Amino acid sequence: MNNNKKTKKRFSLIIILLIVIAGAIAYWQYSSNNSAPPVSKDTPTANTPNRSTAGSRRPPMPPVQVATSAQEDVPQFLTALGTVKAVNSVTVTSRVEGQLMALHFTEGQQVNQGDLLAEIDPRPFEVQLAQAKGQLAKDQATLANARLDLARYQKLAKTHLVSQQELDNQAALVKQSEASISIDKAAINNAQLQLTYSKITAPISGRVGLKQVDVGNYISGGSSTPIVVINQMDPVDVLFTLPEQDLSQVILARKNNPTLPVIALDRNNKIELAQGALFSVDNQIDATTGTIKLKARFPQQESTLFPNQFVNIRLYVTTLEKAVVIPNAALQMGNEGHFVWVVDEENKVSKLAVEVASQNADKVVIASGLSANQRVVTDGVDRLTQGAKVEIVTPLAPKAKTTDPVVAEKA
């Protein structure tokens, strides 16, 4: 009996052990199937050579955008900062003192030379004129009487009834009266002139500014307080300076065209305000700044330029014919100077050193190092290496903005 019990106990233990082993094997197979990567056609098997996955992939080609160098006739300009100045500017003041009786202009009005601008109280000057005329009449009467007496003295002197001294005294009295007449006439002219000055007229044609004094105020003659300022607005001048090293270009260009074209742009250097011509060049260079002053003159029927306005100036000097031009984005700067990335027929890039003739916000004129019809990289230069093959991509066109029909109708 005891042997049978031991046999059954051993048999039970063996069965339990087999069940545990079978469960462990099943768990291991389940875990292996879930963690193994899916097999694809490209996955290495026993039938393929043994090599790493990373070695079977090539790095992607860097995408770039390109532009083609062109050949153009490019005008060359010298740029400068300028200030608008009126060709003529007059501060209108009164020549005589008195109360301001009237103003005959509107602020900002265009006036012509000789137009009446203001009136000073004329009555004091009318009184002075009347006094001068009265004094003239008095002295004329005195002169007439002195001449009659002189005629009598001359007759009496022939009969020796008056002395020669008395005759000479009477002749001097006549001359004295004649001198008084001359003084009186000058006084009349002065009084008439002062009366004329009481009416203030425009000395030049131009635009009046804001009035500086109101009607009713007492004005002193030659006062430092102006009545108004008149600026000639058509044409106007722009004063600007250039470095002395640019003077030779200006002199050479003026030999072919004394009136070089000049363009005035706004403060932001974007909007063209007026077109004019170079008017004059100063006769000396400022030793402190190393610059020379120039003046350009601009006709302006629309009055786009105002005195003391700040403008950007572009002075035309020459035209580069058949120059090689590339976009500004294609030009790069390195330790050795300017260069561009050129793309060949196999879409491989190479670094090419170039010399720049001129440059603006949009284009670069190449002096040497690049020919026309070569492809240059304009975007994606940061990822390029010498001889690398690139993928040329086209920039996406901006999406057209759709207009809400309701909003457009309201607008």
Curated annotation (Swiss-Prot):
Database matches in SUPFAM superfamilies: HlyD-like secretion proteins (SSF111369)
Subcellular location: Cell inner membrane
Keyword set, alphabetical order: Cell inner membrane, Cell membrane, Membrane, Signal, Transport
Signal peptide span: 1-26
Predominant place of localization: membrane
The UniProt record lists the keyword Lipoprotein: no
Region (Disordered): 35-64
Biased composition range(s): Polar residues: 35-55
GO CC annotation: efflux pump complex; plasma membrane
Recorded topology in the membrane: Peripheral membrane protein
GO molecular function terms noted in the UniProt entry: efflux transmembrane transporter activity
Family the entry assigns: Belongs to the membrane fusion protein (MFP) (TC 8.A.1) family.
Subunit structure comment from the entry: Part of a tripartite efflux system composed of MdtA, MdtB and MdtC.
Database matches in NCBIfam families: PRK11556.1, RND_mfp
Protein name (Swiss-Prot/TrEMBL): Multidrug resistance protein MdtA
Phylogenetic placement of the source organism: Bacteria, Pseudomonadati, Pseudomonadota, Gammaproteobacteria, Enterobacterales
